[in-house]
Curated annotation (Swiss-Prot):
Entry keyword set: Cell inner membrane, Cell membrane, Membrane, Transmembrane, Transmembrane helix, Transport
Segments traversing the membrane: 10-30, 53-73, 78-98, 120-140, 152-172
A GO CC annotation given for this chain: plasma membrane
Knockout-associated phenotype: Mutant exhibits lower biotin uptake and has a diminished capacity to form nodules on bean plants.
Predominant subcellular localization, coarse grouping: membrane
Annotated compartments: Cell inner membrane
Record's protein name: Biotin transporter BioY
Length: 187
């Protein structure tokens, strides 16, 4: 990994942590709060690509594991990984990877701005919502004893906000691609 890669992954880890400074919004009927940090996960995948995006998320989760209060609401420590929300945290890694993987394959410099933006949006939707929810809902249903259907239905309240986050990530991805393309070169 080059110095540039290290700096970029550390930068996006810091962005994800900074998004955690925004207070979480609890819905009350499901133990998972609405946070801005999933936007950081989508942005890491869209801007950095699969490998670097996943590494940025891993850095954040390592900071959580050693006890730093870097999650929304000032949460941190190993106990977080035993909570009902742990599946979403693990899903961050795979969500960033899939978002980045799809971004690397769907977006190229020869496309129009609209096609690039839509491609980034699709990548963020699939990686940052579908993949993330697959991990989070499955773990939540198992650990909280809600059952898959109840966990799934309860999680649907987060979809509108996550779609907005995917739009923001797509617009950011397009802006970065125009000004300073960071996505790894395709083979």
């Amino acid at each position: 990994m080059s110095t540039r890669d290290l700096v970029l992954t550390a930068l996006f880890a810091a962005i994800i942590v900074a998004l955690g400074l925004l207070p979480p919004i609890s819905l009350g009927f499901i133990p998972v709060p609405i946070t801005a940090q999933s936007l950081g996960v989508m942005m890491a995948g869209v801007v950095l690509g699969a490998r670097r995006g996943a590494i940025a998320v891993l850095i954040v989760l390592l900071l959580v594991a050693i006890g730093l209060p870097v999650l929304s609401g000032g949460r941190g420590g190993l106990a977080i990984f035993a909570s009902p929300t742990a599946g979403f945290l693990v899903g961050w890694i795979f969500g960033a990877f899939v978002t980045g993987y799809l971004s690397e394959r769907l977006v190229n410099h020869g496309q129009s701005g609209l096609v690039q933006t839509v491609s980034f949006f699709l990548a963020a939707m699939i990686g940052g919502i579908v993949v993330l929810y697959a991990f989070g809902i499955t773990y939540l249903a198992t650990v909280a004893g809600l059952g898959f259907t109840k966990a799934f239905v309860g999680s649907m309240a987060f979809i509108p906000g996550d779609v907005i986050k995917a739009v923001v990530a797509a617009l950011l991805g397009r802006a970065v691609m125009v000004g300073y393309p960071l996505l790894p070169a395709r083979a």
